[in-house]
């Protein structure tokens, strides 16, 4: 059973494209639709989201700056939300999670954020330019993807 679990995670974490901190590779059906940077996101309407995240390390307060994922998707292709039902998110650390399109379509729910208390999010290597998925209606933050590098539509 352990071998099967490891094989499944290896399959989920493989990628034909090189992932880079500070960039989000957008893929669907094995095709690359584009690459987004913080500068690209900053061209879209920004929102501030205050939240407290509960995790094994305790509670942390945040005031994120970012943009709704729906706005990001519509800037790439307004039909994406109709063509696909799920988005697999991946970080540079190979953390992989999933977001249902129905969650993305809910108002005030799924965001790509790039700053906390007005300061750029740090990359895994300590630089500036990281991005993160937050799901506002997920109080424990278990599906938040830090160091976001990939969105794969399914």
Which stretches of residues belong to each language-model region?
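N-terminal intrinsically disordered, low-complexity segments enriched in P/E/S/T
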Residues: 1-154
